[in-house]
Structures are given as structure tokens and as C-alpha cells.
Regions:
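C-terminal structural segments of small proteins and small subunits
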Residues: 63-91
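Short S/T/G/P-rich N-terminal loop/turn motif that feeds into the first structured element of a domain
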Residues: 1-55, 59-71, 94-96
Length: 96
């Protein structure tokens, strides 16, 4: 079975409130078996117009597991905490 990945780029607008999101999202990731591959760190634009300030890449056992995480009560609480703390763009993608 191919792994599932969640790729997000984040524009943090309220760093203090975003810390609460990070606490809650970490608990949700642990509960759903996410492997954190990227969480912040240095970025550099190589091509195009995409220049996110923060990137997150999570690996799950499957595409469906990634979607279950996203729809979970645990992650819903994190999303609620993030609502006024950051602008988020997120996709789920199936690995090879």
C-alpha cells in the first residue's frame, strides 16, 4: 500500500496563537501515526511564484489514513485553534 502525504504551506499571522495550534496538531499527529518529514525549516524558491514561509510535510501509512487524520476530532480542535493564527494551504497526495 502506498503511503499518504499531507503537504501544507503556512503563513503565520499570530505566532502566539499558532503555538497552541502546534501543541494540538502534534497530539493529533501522534494519535494518527503521522511521521513528520518537514516542519518549518529553511526554504528557498527555485522556480515559479510559490514562496511559502513555512512548509509542513507529513507521512501516513496510506492516503486514507491521511484523510482520517485530517477529518479527526483531534485535528479539528487544532484547526479551530489555527483559524485566526495562520493562513493554510494543504493537500493530500498518494505516494508511489
Amino acid at each position: 500500500m502506498a503511503a499518504g502525504y499531507i503537504l501544507a504551506y503556512v503563513d503565520v499571522t499570530d505566532p502566539v496563537q499558532y503555538e497552541q495550534y502546534k501543541v494540538l496538531s502534534t497530539k493529533a499527529m501522534q494519535a494518527h501515526g503521522a511521521e513528520v518529514l518537514v516542519r518549518g525549516g529553511k526554504t528557498e524558491q527555485l522556480e515559479g511564484e510559490w514562496a511559502p514561509t513555512r512548509v509542513v510535510l507529513l507521512k501516513f501509512p496510506s492516503y486514507d489514513a491521511a484523510k482520517v487524520f485530517y477529518d479527526s476530532e483531534e485535528y479539528r480542535a487544532a484547526r479551530d485553534a489555527r483559524a485566526k493564527a495562520a493562513k493554510m494551504n494543504m493537500i493530500v497526495v498518494e505516494g508511489v
